[in-house]
């Protein structure tokens, strides 16, 4: 049986590929795919405006190719983990 961390990492990878395979290059997230991922997989997603998601894409897109590759997605996950950690620290 896989350890919880193994399962969590596998899920993060699977979610990337679930959305990246919907349009164009199956190894990148388009603006539409990223928007759908955020809105469906994150609690805060439904609260974000289109302009905020567009800004997020621009910030994540380090090489400015108008898509988010897996490395850029992992950077996004790292930033989310930092935010979640701060929230948890504040609650305790």
UniProtKB/Swiss-Prot annotation:
Q: Which GO terms describe its molecular function?
A: calcium ion binding; calcium-dependent protein binding; S100 protein binding
Q: Which residues bind Ca(2+) 2?
A: 61, 63, 65, 72
Has the keyword Ion transport been applied to this entry? no
Which coarse location class applies to the principal site listed for this UniProt protein? nucleus
Q: Which InterPro entries match?
A: EF-hand-dom_pair, EF_Hand_1_Ca_BS, EF_hand_dom, S-100A6, S100/CaBP7/8-like_CS, S100_Ca-bd_sub
Q: What keywords is this UniProt entry annotated with?
A: Acetylation, Calcium, Cell membrane, Cytoplasm, Membrane, Metal-binding, Nucleus, Repeat
- Per UniProt, Ca(2+) 1 binds at 28, 33
Sorted alphabetically, which CDD domains does this protein's record hold?
S-100A6
Q: Which cysteines are joined by disulfide bonds?
A: none
**Keyword hit for Acetylation:** yes
Q: Which parts of the sequence belong to the EF-hand domain?
A: 12-47, 48-83
* Role noted for this protein: May function as calcium sensor and modulator, contributing to cellular calcium signaling. May function by interacting with other proteins, such as TPR-containing proteins, and indirectly play a role in many physiological processes such as the reorganization of the actin cytoskeleton and in cell motility. Binds 2 calcium ions. Calcium binding is cooperative.
Protein name, entry field: Protein S100-A6
């Amino acid at each position: 049986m896989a350890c919880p961390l193994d399962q969590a990492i596998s899920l993060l990878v699977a979610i990337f590929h679930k959305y990246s395979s919907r349009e164009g290059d199956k190894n990148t997230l388009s603006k539409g795919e990223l928007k759908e991922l955020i809105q469906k997989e994150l609690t805060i997603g439904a609260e974000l405006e289109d302009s905020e998601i567009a800004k997020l894409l621009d910030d994540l897109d380090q090489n400015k190719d108008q898509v988010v590759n897996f490395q850029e997605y992992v950077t996004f996950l790292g930033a989310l983990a930092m935010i979640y950690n701060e929230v948890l620290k504040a609650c305790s």
